[in-house]
Structure formats: structure tokens, C-alpha cells
């Protein structure tokens, strides 16, 4: 997975503008008006939270590395830029993306084992017939044009740790922020290095007290980022004002000398703020009920 990102299919074929993503989704709404009216679904970010939590449950049963789960989330996003979710079984897509991601991230699982574990989690949505997963895998690979290598921000974060003298708490929080960005459209909009820099900035600027930041950063960051912290980010491009703390100043100096697009970093941070705001509306029960009704009514579990 160490291939050059700048020459990658991810950069050349799987980065979109916000406008293009909006056009794709609007086209789905226009083309599938009846399905959209019959089966309303929550905000896409709330669905992303639900899918992520289900992937984590599946991954824990097989001690799967975080990077494989992240790759699976990217596969799901890519697949749904080509397919209307209301004509699919999201549980099968999720399971298949997990199975394929494990192979690509060199932690493969046997297909029968994956199907068995998925059935133990979602018995009403996953058939014991392993050929269904095989068929879905073929569809997934086809829709992604066999472009399966995914570059993640985790690697850049590791490099920035020593360069910016990040503490273990800052690295842990930045790692959690990277985990959270997969719940948004950011993996389809920005390069991994921009996401990594955003995560470091958030960890350094908004860092709460020492703590354990495994999983999501939402609980510790939501309030800090919402309650005026964005002003400091806006000041990154401003030479006036009060002197920031030394660690923040070091980050600002590093950014000024780098070729990182500061505007893009700030846009990513704003997207994260929006995620943490909408997260307050999240209901696992609601997502499960709406998806379940859709799958069962349309017999997508067969």
C-alpha cells in the first residue's frame, strides 16, 4: 500500500468536487423519485455513523485492524456514488466491503467466516449463501473499476508526529479525528495529507485535557469546536491578533513553510464541526428500523 499517492487512481479517479457529489446525489433523487418517497432515510452522515458502528462490531469479532475498516468505509462511499442505496442491501454491501478490504489490507478472512460472523450480527439481512457475497464482491470491484488501493491519512500522521513534536495524547486525538472523517464526504473530497494536517491542527488547537481518545473524537471535541474555537482556525491566515500558544505557533509556522492548502484544511475542519453537530441527532434504532423496512419491503435480503 506504499505506492505513490500522487500517481494513484484514488487521486485521479476518486476525488470529487462538492458540486459534483451534489449532482450525483440529485441525479439519484430524480431517477429514483418513487424509492426516495417510499423509503426516506436519515442524513447521509447519520447513515455513515451507523455503517461505521456496524463495521466496528464486525471487525471486533475478527480482530481486524483499523486501516482495513477505513478502507471498507471508502469502498462503501465509492460504491454509492455509482448506485442508489435504496436498490441495494446495505448490510450485504457493508459485509462485502469489509471482506474485500481485509484482502487488500493484507489481513484476509475466509469468506465463510465473514458470512458467518455477519449473520450472527444481522441474521435477518444476511443469507448463509456465500455466493451472494461473492456476487456482491464482483459488483463492488466492477463499480470501482478494480481501483482498490486506498491511501489513508494515518501514514502522514505518523510522519508528522516527530516533525511537529506531537505528544502521545495529541497523536491519539488526531488518530480519532481521522477515524471520524470517514463519517463525512471528506475522503471523496480531499487528499489524505490534507486530512492528516487537519487532524493534527484539531488535536493541537482544540486539545482538551489528557485522556483516552480511542474510537471517535466526537465526545471530547464537539463542544470545544462548536463554542467559538473556529475563530482560532480562521486566524491561521491572519497575521494580526494575540500570540497563540507555542505549540500552535509551531504548527502555524510549519503550515506557512509547507505547500499544504490552508483553505482546504479549514474547510475540512468546518466539515468536522458539522458532523459533530448532526451527531447529536443520531439514533441507531432509527437507522436500523428505516434500513430494515427498506430491505425487507423490497426483498433485498434474498
From Swiss-Prot:
SUPFAM superfamilies xrefs: Cyclin-like
On whether Lipid metabolism is a keyword of this UniProt record, the answer is no
Q: Name one GO biological process term.
A: regulation of transcription by RNA polymerase II
Q: Name one GO molecular function term.
A: cyclin-dependent protein serine/threonine kinase regulator activity
Keywords on record: Activator, Cyclin, Nucleus, Repressor, Transcription, Transcription regulation
Which ranges carry the Cyclin N-terminal domain? 53-142
| Main location class | nucleus
* Pfam families in the cross-refs: Cyclin_N (PF00134)
Q: Which domain of life is it from?
A: Eukaryota
| Keyword Lipid biosynthesis in annotation | no
Q: List locations, semicolon-separated.
A: Nucleus
Q: Which Gene3D superfamilies match?
A: Cyclin-like (1.10.472.10)
One GO cellular component, as annotated: nucleus
Instruction: Cite the InterPro entries for this sequence.
Output: Cyclin-like_dom, Cyclin-like_sf, Cyclin/Ssn8, Cyclin_N
Q: How does it assemble?
A: Component of the srb8-11 complex, a regulatory module of the Mediator complex.
Purpose: Component of the srb8-11 complex. The srb8-11 complex is a regulatory module of the Mediator complex which is itself involved in regulation of basal and activated RNA polymerase II-dependent transcription. The srb8-11 complex may be involved in the transcriptional repression of a subset of genes regulated by Mediator. It may inhibit the association of the Mediator complex with RNA polymerase II to form the holoenzyme complex. The srb8-11 complex phosphorylates the C-terminal domain (CTD) of the largest subunit of RNA polymerase II.
Family from the record: Belongs to the cyclin family. Cyclin C subfamily.
Task: Please report the name of this protein according to its UniProt entry.
Answer: RNA polymerase II holoenzyme cyclin-like subunit
